[in-house]
Amino acid sequence: MNARMRFAASAAISVWLMGACANIPVPAGIASVPGVGPDKPVMTVAGELPPVPSHTWPDLNEDLNDHRADGWGLVFMPEMEKYLNGLLRKIKVATGTADWPGAVHITAQTSLNASSSAAGNIYISLGWLQSAESEDEIFAILSHEFGHIYLNHYAVYDVKNAGDTSTLIAGVTWTYVNRKVADKGWNGLDKIAVVQAIGTMALMPAWQRHIEEQADLFGATVSLRCGYSYIHGFKAFLERIDSYDRDARARNAKLREEQDNAIREKIRTDTLARAPKTPPPPAVASDAAVPLQALAAINDALTKVNGALTEGQISLNQGTFSAAQALDDAIAKGTAAIQDPHPDGAAREDDLSKEVATLIAGKRPPGRVKPWEDAKHQRRNAQTLAHYALVPDIEMLEAQHRYAEALKLAAKAASGANADDAMLDFYLGNAIALSQGRSKESPVQAFSRNLKSPERSWRLQVAIANNMASTNRQQARSFIEQQFVYFGRAPKAWPDLIAFYRDSGDVKGAKDMAMTCSVTLPDYRQACLSASQTPAELAEAKAKADAHAKIVVDNVSKRWFKQ
């Protein structure tokens, strides 16, 4: 079928499928604007789209596998994906791109994140599905992300984070990933924070605001032409970004506060347990009934803690609390601050509302709430959203060291339709390790559930392989290499496999693979090379970064042990 026939067919499908979703006019002279062409389309006015640009499409499956290997991977929600892809189909028909590749996939993130890729895929987080209140809002998100694809932003702008991110965390996070599964040196939240820091960052594009505004204008144009409400759609979408960011900052601050309090209380309790058992002095109204020796011991312990924070670690009765744990949280929060996937929501909404003012004048269609509610309340979707909604409570319980309660809640989350979900299996395994024998299931058994899922997580496969390596290196190597093939040799998985070779004694294999990576996957060059470094090489690299490390440690120590 030639291009003209395909366009005619698209128009016919548009009328048949969509009714209210009208074809969007293209300004006749836009291709002649200096610096603008079919490969570099630009939105100039609301209501009009530039001509459909030509695209060079990367491999769709490679893109999908790379996102499966990223962070917690994807969530198996076939009914929800069917609904979302129906909305994407509307967008494609309305823009004359019905034959373009790509689909909507759901990421295992409870934050508000959405992204698209040069291959044509759109990735939307569970957090958005939990938070959005109407189909208008979901359509706004999808049309915005499709705008990045249509406007060829991936080809025109250098927006990849992979190189910068791998440089930022090189020599640190890959080592953390390869810690033993049941390493009691990890606090529950530390382990979770580092996996989240490693995931999502490398593949999330670093859009500048003017690029985001182009995608906003594109999405609003498509959304309004398809009869969706601006108030319930784009306005709600952009305003929710800012309100979520405020709430997330407050919640993270509360989590850190609870974690700090629990750590300090543990130190105080251990110090009191070691204090000499001597009679207390006479009680006075202004003093607590605590032995003076114990008070002195507590003060002494806190003083030593401050010194030990920069030197190494503090031994407690259960496991080990190290300075590295404090840095884990700083790394996660620091990378999140560097990558803002949706800057300036309120300011963008102000600008966008002015651009579309003439298009929405006198038009106030009601929000399409029922279709969205029907989709969310489909049985599997409802259970999945409810189970992932338990994650913040699990994190808070772990921050408070209430591990038995955290385990009970994690077991509930990783059940039913979500028994094999990667993120929830990880939370369950983590809670099992922290609760110390309160479960018949081991952490690795919890992680291994994910092998039965249609959506495996590379991160859990790495954890399983590292655990295997402690007893059978050859079996572990065979397992992780099989998983590497299963994930289509995804670029995101290369540093982990290289680090596995290094840690299992095959330094030459690690070096050889790192060199191949540096040539064939330039975005991951630094991460691959760092993952191949031996402890001696890492120590040398660390020595060169001592000044930076001292700044980070000093900042963390001020927060963790304020008197």
Give the positions of each predicted feature.
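Bacterial N-terminal signal peptides that target proteins for export
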Residues: 1-11
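A Zn2+-metalloprotease active-site environment signal
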Residues: 22-563
